[in-house]
């Protein structure tokens, strides 16, 4: 007697096959570059999930992971064998295990917080020389929070807060000429938000593409550039 067929509904994004190929190339680059402990599974290693071409498992701390499922041949009854889609879900590893679907922006925000810093260490030295950075390495992770503050603004704000704390404790003498209540450092931080970058037309825009879920789901159609200045057309 044949068992009853059980259906599992997934939230997916229909994408072209060449976009998946390009995204996989970006993932392989970062796995080598950062030695990321992401796991990759081919379709023959996923015996129970039909139409799954491959899967990427991204550990998130000790208690969860993000599973990125790449589907193919979703409509064989109509002869559309080149139909591809992407599914993203969070899987909890706690005692009470559960799964939940993720949208690309939420997944990017989680991945950004665990694997990619906003700015490289080298950017701090460049900021001291006057370069302005308004985009982090993983800007897709800030979709829900808005634009990334400039590195100068973050550094000056931290410096100003440090001055205030030391002033309260009385361990250092008060800095001179702080200006208004906000302080000269605070006013300088505001000016840096809108100040143009000296010696360049772009503000930290040329970078190596990151393995963004928004990119994979087809939500971003833009030409990105690598560090060597050569264009990489995503779509």
Swiss-Prot record:
Role summary: Counteracts the innate antiviral activity of APOBEC3G. Forms a complex with host APOBEC3G thus preventing the entry of this lethally hypermutating enzyme into progeny virions. Functions as an adapter molecule, recruiting APOBEC3G to the ubiquitin-proteasome machinery. Targets APOBEC3G for degradation through the assembly with elongin BC complex, CUL5 and RBX1. Binds viral RNA and affects the stability of viral nucleoprotein core. May play a role in viral morphology.
Any one annotated GO CC term: virion component
Induction (free text): Expressed late during infection in a Rev-dependent manner.
Disordered as annotated region, ranges: 164-188
Motif BC-box-like motif: chain residues: 150-159
Highest taxon, organism lineage: Viruses
Domain topic, free-text comment: The BC-like-box motif mediates the interaction with elongin BC complex.
Residues the record lists as Phosphoserine modifications: 150
Signal peptide interval: none
Locus of motif HCCH motif: 112-142
Residues with Phosphothreonine modification: 100
Record region (Multimerization): 157-169
Protein name: Virion infectivity factor
Family assignment from sequence similarity: Belongs to the primate lentivirus group Vif protein family.
Subcellular location as annotated: Host cytoplasm; Host cell membrane; Virion
InterPro entries noted in UniProt: Vif
Main location group: host cell
One protein family per Pfam: Vif
GO annotation, biological process: viral life cycle
Membrane-related topology note: Peripheral membrane protein
Self-association and partners: Homomultimer; in vitro and presumably in vivo. Interacts with viral Pr55Gag precursor and host APOBEC3G. The interaction between Vif and APOBEC3G is species-specific, which may play a role in restricting the replication of SIV to their host. Forms an E3 ligase complex by interacting with host CUL5 and elongin BC complex (ELOB and ELOC).
Biased composition regions of type Basic residues, renumbered to the chain: 166-176
Keywords: Host cell membrane, Host cytoplasm, Host membrane, Host-virus interaction, Membrane, Phosphoprotein, Ubl conjugation, Ubl conjugation pathway, Virion
Biological source species: Simian immunodeficiency virus agm.vervet (isolate AGM TYO-1) (SIV-agm.ver)
Post-translational modification (record): Processed in virion by the viral protease.
């Amino acid at each position: 007697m044949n068992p009853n067929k059980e259906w599992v509904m997934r939230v997916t994004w229909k994408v072209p096959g060449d976009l998946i190929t390009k995204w996989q190339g970006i993932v392989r680059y970062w796995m080598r570059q950062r030695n990321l402990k992401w796991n990759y599974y081919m379709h023959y290693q996923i015996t129970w999930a039909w139409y799954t071409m491959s899967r990427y498992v991204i550990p998130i701390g000790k208690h969860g992971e993000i599973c990125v499922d790449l589907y193919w041949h979703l409509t064989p009854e109509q002869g559309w064998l080149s139909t591809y889609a992407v599914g993203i879900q969070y899987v909890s590893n706690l005692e009470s295990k559960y799964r939940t679907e993720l949208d690309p922006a939420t997944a990017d925000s989680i991945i950004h917080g665990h694997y990619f810093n906003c700015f490289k260490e080298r950017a701090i030295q460049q900021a001291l020389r006057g370069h302005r950075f308004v985009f982090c390495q993983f800007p897709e992770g800030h979709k829900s929070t808005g634009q990334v503050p400039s590195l100068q603004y973050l550094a000056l704000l931290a410096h100003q807060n440090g001055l205030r704390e030391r002033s309260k404790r009385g361990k250092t003498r008060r800095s001179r000429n702080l200006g208004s209540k906000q302080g000269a450092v605070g006013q300088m931080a505001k000016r840096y938000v809108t100040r143009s970058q000296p010696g360049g037309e772009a503000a930290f825009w040329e970078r190596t593409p990151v393995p963004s879920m928004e990119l994979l789901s087809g939500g971003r159609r833009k030409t990105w550039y690598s560090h060597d200045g050569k264009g990489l057309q995503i779509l």
